[in-house]
Amino acid sequence: MNIKDIGVIVAKKPLKENTFIITVFTKNYGLYSGVVKASSKKSKFIYQEGNIVDFLWMARLHEHIGIAKCELIKSYTGYFITNKTKLYAFNSIISLIKELLHEREEYSNFFSFLINYLDNLSKKFFFRDYINFELALLDIAGYKLDLSKCAVSNVKQDLYYVSPKSGRALSYEVGKPYKDKLLILPKFLLSDNSKITLEEKRQALTLTNYFFNRYLFHNNRHAEARQAFMEYILHRCHPAT
């Protein structure tokens, strides 16, 4: 059977000399892995993580790993390699997709979201966009956070906490008696115009990290590239964007 689709390469592992196993996040079929041969310098460039490609997968049976061929549509390497912040963010989102999404499940809406994010990241890094990407990833994984109103009173003002059990927002007054057991809701997630402080970045990464660890990272497994991104962002001062 054959599958042909547009996709983003999210992993590349050496198998033997000039032969690799690549994993591609496709628009209509989700994650697919296949064996590729890349002997020339040009072909090796095609199979870099983050490249958007025309993807052809061929196998006798669906459950086989298959043979893959790709034609390059767009490479982001030049946009990210010279900017550390962009590179850390890029590596993080690619690793999260590889670690958290299920093989051969369709995520077409999220694929479009990813392409849009990569295009925006190639122009400029915004921390707000990055956190929105992580929230969207939690959503498609089945753990959407409801930050629109207080889970108890339904008010939309003075939201301050997030319940670690329900993933829903709580107002300051409702959550105050239980504050030691709650997560902080960063102010910038409630307003598009607010500047983002370093502490709010820490709060936001703590928030998404909690739900990643609770529901999606099992057996102490985690995305190392995301850990590196967190360390970089939280230990260096960047403009509040």
Curated annotation (Swiss-Prot):
This is DNA repair protein RecO. Involved in DNA repair and RecF pathway recombination. The keyword Ribonucleoprotein does not apply. It holds the Pfam family RecO_C. The keyword DNA damage applies. GO terms for biological process: DNA recombination; double-strand break repair. Belongs to the RecO family. It comes from Rickettsia canadensis (strain McKiel). GO terms for cellular component: bacterial nucleoid. InterPro entries: ARFGAP/RecO (IPR037278), DNA_rep/recomb_RecO_N (IPR022572), NA-bd_OB-fold (IPR012340), RecO (IPR003717), RecO_C (IPR042242). Signal peptide: none annotated. Keywords: DNA damage, DNA recombination, DNA repair.
